Curated annotation (Swiss-Prot):
HAMAP family (UniProt xref): DNApol_clamp_arch
Protein family (similarity comment): Belongs to the PCNA family.
Native species: Anguilla japonica
InterPro entries, per database record: DNA_clamp_sf, Pr_cel_nuc_antig, Pr_cel_nuc_antig_C, Pr_cel_nuc_antig_CS, Pr_cel_nuc_antig_N
Residue(s) of cross-link: Glycyl lysine isopeptide (Lys-Gly) (interchain with G-Cter in ubiquitin): K164
Chief location of this protein within or outside the cell: nucleus
Protein name from the UniProt record: Proliferating cell nuclear antigen
Length: 260
């Protein structure tokens, strides 16, 4: 038996919004330590990794490990039936072919009960090696989303150049070129508004903007985003999920010739 209750149910709604446009179906691995998901997108260009720790839920029970094959589109549709203030409970029997979703209003006056059919998914787990990164940039997530959206008007790829004093986002296309430079902030009242850069060596890499725009669907989950970069290995875009875990997106850099 698996049962997880989340008083702040809107977090789960935001998680689905962050995933569903990139991956259509995925295996939710449920264990006593929490819920995790790892999946390549349908074109096998990017990878998503989600962790929701059990201690972040208001109550959590998992008697044995389960692999729940979920259509993210279906789950997103069902979660749209939950109000933003609703308490959400997920429940599955040990060998169930459905996942129950229960939505309760805070005053308990309305309880909605949905059952979603599960899928049989054949999923390969990819090992994600722990890496030391040449450059780690932490910045407001809304600012990152805005930069990706703005530069998408100019070109379909962005060059991210990271140096000690700041990070530059550059795009070029038929219209011309665009550059956005963010300097490391020295004194900011709100930590969430700060731009911080930890750099071992300068990095300059090119990434497809359409994928970065998919990743920014996770912006409502966190006020900050962390970009971790090193030459020739995938960029990691990480959004923390308050007291619960994170969603990480991995995207391999484009090779220079492709970026023109």
């Amino acid at each position: 038996m698996f049962e997880a209750r989340l008083v702040q149910g809107s977090i789960l709604k935001k998680v689905l919004e962050a995933l569903k446009d990139l991956i259509t179906e995925a295996c939710w691995d449920v264990s006593s330590s929490g819920i995790s998901l790892q999946s390549m997108d349908s074109s096998h260009v990017s990878l998503v990794q989600l962790t929701l720790r059990s201690d972040g839920f208001d109550s959590y029970r998992c008697d044995r490990n389960l692999a729940l094959g979920v259509s993210l589109n279906s789950m997103s549709k069902m979660l749209k039936c939950a109000g933003n203030e609703d308490i959400i409970t997920l429940r599955a029997e040990d060998n169930a072919d459905t996942l129950a979703l229960v939505f309760e209003t805070l005053n308990q006056e309305k309880v909605s009960d949905y059952e979603m059919k599960l899928m049989d998914l054949d999923v390969e787990q990819l090992g994600i090696p722990e890496q030391e990164y040449s450059c780690v940039v932490k910045m407001p997530s809304g600012e990152f989303a805005r930069i990706c959206r703005d530069l998408s008007q100019i070109g379909d790829a962005v060059m991210i150049s990271c140096a000690k004093d700041g990070v530059m986002f550059s795009a070029s296309g038929e219209l011309g070129t665009g550059n956005v430079k963010l300097s490391q902030t020295s004194n900011v009242d709100e930590e969430d508004d700060a731009v911080t850069i930890e750099m071992n060596e300068p990095v300059q890499l090119i990434f497809a903007l359409n994928y970065l725009n998919f990743f920014t669907k996770a912006t409502p989950l966190s006020k900050t985003v962390t970009l971790s970069m090193s030459a020739d290995i995938p960029l990691v875009v990480e959004y923390k999920i308050a007291d619960m875990g994170h969603v990480k997106y991995y995207l391999a850099p484009k090779i220079d010739e492709e970026a023109s």
